[in-house]
Amino acid sequence: MSRLTDLPAWQALEDHYYELQGTHLRELFAADPERGEKMNAEGAGLYLDYSKHRVTDETLRLLRELAQATGVEARRDAMFRGEKINVTEGRAVLHTALRAPRDAVIEVDGKNVVPEVHEVLDRMATFADAVRSGEWLGYTGKPIKNIVNIGIGGSDLGPVMAYEALKHYAQRDLTVRFVSNVDGTDLTEKTRDLDPEVTLFIVSSKTFTTQETMTNARSARKWLLGSLKDDAAVTRHFVAVSTNAEEVQKFGIDTANMFGFWDWVGGRYSMDSAIGLSLMVAVGPEHFREMLAGFHDMDEHFRTAPAEQNLPMLMGLLGVWYGDFFGAESLAVLPYDQYLASFPAYLQQLDMESNGKHVTLGGEPVDYQTGPIVWGQAGTNGQHAFYQLIHQGTKLIPCDFIGFCQTLNPLPPHHDLLMANVFAQTEALAFGKTLEQVLADGVAPEVAPHRVFEGNRPTSTILADRLTPRTLGALIALYEHKVFVQGAVWDINSFDQWGVELGKVLAKKIDGELQSEGEPELQHDSSTNALIRRYRARRQG
């Protein structure tokens, strides 16, 4: 047994699970009719109803004891202090500094990093205002109308999600697009109807050597110069988010138009940094800063709220409860707002890249479940796709429902109907429909078993008044810190991502073999060798 599963707090939860596993949510609500009024918490403008979870007060107490025993709060405080809790890379983890107010003091190696953060934010704001106002002109003297962000992973998923989420607040005479996939189709389709004279590319790569990003960037430069015919045009149509001034300059970008960030910011936590430049251009510096304020609101809530009312702590511990004791393998995130359609995809990287780990901080194999598979879709579309399996399938899938009390686009009766579905789905998942109830409805006995809903499917419901930049910031930070809580309990490093490296190394080797003019000497396994040979033989059509 590992250190974690050896803990009395863990073993107490195991015993408690065996006592509680057969208890239905119907029973829990019957035993306490006011359960829904009690099992909720609020912070940073978000309201969390966790009453439809398969927990009792005793469950929650035992989960908090596990958090105490695994040092979650101590590790949280170490993160906020700037200690190097990313032990495999020897780095501090300070995405929280990206949204700290100007007068905050957050030190890394004895240096307050906050002034530098705000210096970059101020430079970003000056640039964004220049583009938005038409002051920034392209090579031929025309104002910019199209923004294309080129990045991948954390340099893409966050800005894409946030741009879509805040589109209501965007400057509509600017077209904003995102290119990430090294598949040439992505860049081709995103630029097909754009005019190079009024298009600006933001190339986001810390090292400016990321293979996919730089392949796209070079092709974008070729596309631009195919029309403008002068290398000098690059300086008016490309800016960089990077820390590698030498490579940026080599590409043809003026380093005065390079926006940097720091090694204490992980890629999937970087959208508050210069990585969010495309978003700031789209929605404006004021709305971007409002979003940062929302992040900071949740940071402070996570840092100061007691465990029993702490939203990230509650959500993180509930995830541990289902993953490690009930054996749930996935989490469905279901935002009932079309603006949040990309939120589940963003959370996939945030959660799965952070907590998809199989060894502890000390390098020992774990003997328990770590991060879940995260997936989902905007409601109500998902109801007509995969909810069938959640309701009547054989897998236990905890769900997070996200909704807003006010819509940004009043179109009666749409919003009431949308939110009616949120509340109906969580009720149906919790309480289901028994065979007796189905038969009482007059359903034929031979059909009745097919109409039974077992229920007892756990859900969280997160409500906010309105989707604003500030609300979005708080919502993202809630999930960031939820992931942190789980990583701390599991004693894993949530801030490295070595799992992406091996494939990258092999791809570089295979790319050389694919481009070889002569027949390469292949030394892979027989399957990979056969696939390479077939591709080489057939790629010309």
From Swiss-Prot:
Residues in coiled coil: none
Location of the active site: 353, 384, 504
Domain of life of the organism encoding this protein: Bacteria
GO cellular component: cytosol
Top-tier EC class: isomerase
Subcellular location: Cytoplasm
Keywords: Cytoplasm, Gluconeogenesis, Glycolysis, Isomerase
E.C. designation(s): 5.3.1.9
PROSITE patterns according to UniProt: P_GLUCOSE_ISOMERASE_1, P_GLUCOSE_ISOMERASE_2, P_GLUCOSE_ISOMERASE_3
GO BP term, pick one: glucose 6-phosphate metabolic process
GO molecular function, one term: glucose-6-phosphate isomerase activity
Record field: catalytic activity: alpha-D-glucose 6-phosphate = beta-D-fructose 6-phosphate
Pathway: Carbohydrate biosynthesis; gluconeogenesis; Carbohydrate degradation; glycolysis; D-glyceraldehyde 3-phosphate and glycerone phosphate from D-glucose: step 2/4
CDD domains: SIS_PGI_1, SIS_PGI_2
Record keyword Hydrolase present: no
Protein family: Belongs to the GPI family.
Function per UniProt: Catalyzes the reversible isomerization of glucose-6-phosphate to fructose-6-phosphate.
PANTHER family, alphabetized: GLUCOSE-6-PHOSPHATE ISOMERASE
UniProt-recorded name of the protein: Glucose-6-phosphate isomerase
Origin species: Deinococcus radiodurans (strain ATCC 13939 / DSM 20539 / JCM 16871 / CCUG 27074 / LMG 4051 / NBRC 15346 / NCIMB 9279 / VKM B-1422 / R1)
